[in-house]
């Protein structure tokens, strides 16, 4: 059984990680251990590079805390070009896989609040009245009328980031 360290305790992210790993490696093939680690970037990262750096830092910090694992996974959400997206970073002892998720354009009223210094999650909670929306469907769920959720978008990115781990051509 693969020991997978999730460098987050966010249920939406953990669900995406578990579902993707089980789809790639088989149901019941992994045990996910969520841990809280620092990203080393602001709570609301801006730009692709800052966001990817946050995910890479989370993986590095998770590896320090749990060096015995088989995989370390981080999902860092950010804002870039008036949209929200995330970077997924997955490492094993030998490999790294990275993928950027789909992007969701954000309304100007939401962006104004985020640019004023609030993170997207709290802004969306105020906008919708849903507590801790970032741990649930997120802005993605709200603005796609529930057709997609944070977890479903992250799931695709985790699947893509796992590609080097089960395709020999990457090695």
From Swiss-Prot:
Pfam families xref list: NTPase_I-T
UniProt xrefs under SUPFAM superfamilies: ITPase-like
Keywords: Hydrolase, Magnesium, Manganese, Metal-binding, Nucleotide metabolism, Nucleotide-binding
A GO term, aspect molecular function: ribonucleoside triphosphate phosphatase activity
Catalytic activity: XTP + H2O = XDP + phosphate + H(+); ITP + H2O = IDP + phosphate + H(+)
Lineage top rank: taxon: Bacteria
Cofactor(s) demanded: Mg(2+); Mn(2+)
Enzyme class: hydrolase
EC nos: 3.6.1.73
Keyword Hydrolase: yes
Binding-site list for substrate: 8-13, 68-69
Example GO BP: thiamine metabolic process
Details of cofactor binding: Binds 1 divalent metal cation per subunit; can use either Mg(2+) or Mn(2+).
InterPro entries xref list: ITPase-like_fam, Non_canon_purine_NTPase, NTPase/PRRC1, YjjX_NTPase
Residues noted as binding Mg(2+) in the record, renumbered to the chain: 38, 68
Family named by the database record: Belongs to the YjjX NTPase family.
Oligomer status and interactors: Homodimer.
Purpose: Phosphatase that hydrolyzes non-canonical purine nucleotides such as XTP and ITP to their respective diphosphate derivatives. Probably excludes non-canonical purines from DNA/RNA precursor pool, thus preventing their incorporation into DNA/RNA and avoiding chromosomal lesions.
This protein's name: Inosine/xanthosine triphosphatase
